[in-house]
Amino acid sequence: DDLVFFFVGIVILYLFVLAVASHFKRIVYPKAEKKYHCAILVPEESPLPVIYREESYEFFTYNDLHQGINTLDREHYQLVLILSNTAISLSPLFLEKIYNAYDAGIQAIQLHTVIENRKGFCNRFRAICKEIKNSLFRAGNTQFGLSSNLSGTNMAIDLGWLQNNLRSSKTNIERKLFQKNVYIDYLPDAIVYCQSSPVHPYRRRLRKTASYFFPSLLEGNWNFCNRIVQHLIPSPLKMCIFVSV
């Protein structure tokens, strides 16, 4: 019992440090010196989200993500933005903030997902859990120079990198980025408003995820090690139930 509570205490301390760090001042990227073009991908039969008037973007719908990305011309588009099927609108100056980060050398960006529908206990609880994860595992991580977690949707990634590394629609983009040690930033001011909580596109395979820990540790890939640890931490609901018991 003492050992269990010791590990629980370590986890709580770890999460507390991330929570405090998430409120520190963030880096503001300077205005992009170049003009970029962005391809915005949304699933077929999904409504196109409302976007404030901005230049240099085009909407595309896709049924197969791998096929959709590989049909894009990398000579014309530098960035690809993958949105969830529940996205309804984007915040003002949305693309400008993404372009500023990309111009500074950031190849992968997790955007801030905000759930609009909060009617009822379940929807409100999902929205709260989403914001907790945003604060801890995205904003908190980046304050320590570690990569943000990637949700699999509502993200912006360098098109050339995606076309070179996305082998199929089942490829786990987040895992591939961590394995290649590509830094993932989080932009809390680039907001994607969603009608409901987006579905995570990857299966949660704890055993397979844990198997990457020691190889990543030996390689000194601290970003991936940190992500694996966070992947193994129970959800906020399970943590609350365990602590209350």
Regions found by a protein language model. Name each.
Residues 161-188, 200:
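A short, conserved alpha-helix in the catalytic core of glycosyltransferases
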Residues 108, 116, 156, 168, ...:
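Conserved active-site beta-strand element of glycosyltransferases/polysaccharide synthases
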Residues 77-89:
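Short beta-strand-to-loop acidic/aromatic patch adjacent to the donor-nucleotide binding site
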Residues 1, 5, 24-32, 144-145, ...:
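Basic/Trp-rich segment in TM-proximal cytosolic loops or flexible interdomain/linker regions
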Residues 75, 98-166, 203, 207:
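Long helical/loop segments within the catalytic core of UDP-sugar-dependent glycosyltransferases
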Residues 68-79:
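Active-site nucleotide-sugar/metal-binding loop of Leloir-type enzymes
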